Amino acid sequence: MRSELSVTSSIFEANRARGAVRFDVHARDGVTRRGVLHESGSLRVRFPSPEDEGLSGVFVNTAGGVAGGDRFDVEISAADAARLTLTTAAAEKVYRAPGPAAELNIALKVGAGAHLSWLPQETILFDRARVHRRFDIALDEAASLLLCEIVVFGRTAMGERMEQGEFVDRWRLSRGGRLVFAETVRLGGDIGAKLARSAVAKGGAAIGTALIVPGDEALIERIREASESFAGEVGISAWNGFAMARFCAQDAARLRADMMAVLARTGAALPRLWLN
């Protein structure tokens, strides 16, 4: 006979969400067009009317959020000279996970002369959520990239904070076939206490990263001109043709405002959904 634990595990697995999106875009006569699109499970991507800047895509999670044991995979390729902007229809909520962690895997490839803007709305981690996220990014030497992520530890708009849980965020970026950036953030256990440390978040509940390629000292100076308007902590550095901005704030609203101020200095066009 199957044990009660085995039956419970089987039911849990059967109720986990799965979703995958895979597509490529290419440019012809200055117009970016989508190639073959593969969608499965509860993850979808929709393409509003074409814009002068290129093609825009909006991810929709029909599962209504992410729970423990869920898995979502995204694989996107922008061929030479293509221009693509991606965002999400809403903030992604990651719920409490009594079992395995949720997995989010994103693979991005950008060709020569192509540009990709990855600008999802914030990811909100509920108390005791567990999620492992992985970015694998491959850039041509002549490609450009704007990759922004905001993570909020708790529903700050409701006065809630994430106290316990697990968040693992792994970024790997190669350029011209060489690994040029690798970082893994691991927060687990008593996350609330760790975020309270001065060397971590100084009590902030929202963190963000903006990776800009190419980026240089001139870009840093333009961003510093906006520093007096920042509501939270913002730091930026540049090296080897990259620029990276780090953000920390008390809540999602303040952090988003700071990130928008930084992006305005880069000349980036924000998705309309960010402005609603």
Swiss-Prot record:
Oligomer status and interactors: UreD, UreF and UreG form a complex that acts as a GTP-hydrolysis-dependent molecular chaperone, activating the urease apoprotein by helping to assemble the nickel containing metallocenter of UreC. The UreE protein probably delivers the nickel.
Give a yes or no for keyword Cytoplasm in this entry.
yes
The principal location of this protein is cytoplasm
State the InterPro entries in the record: UreD
**Whose protein is this, by species?**
Bradyrhizobium diazoefficiens (strain JCM 10833 / BCRC 13528 / IAM 13628 / NBRC 14792 / USDA 110)
Q: Which cell locations does it reside in? A: Cytoplasm
Protein name (record): Urease accessory protein UreD
**Which HAMAP family is this protein grouped with?**
UreD (MF_01384)
Annotated Gene Ontology cellular components are: cytoplasm
Q: Does the keyword Chaperone apply?
A: yes
| Family label | Belongs to the UreD family.
Task: List the molecular function annotations (GO) for this entry.
Answer: nickel cation binding
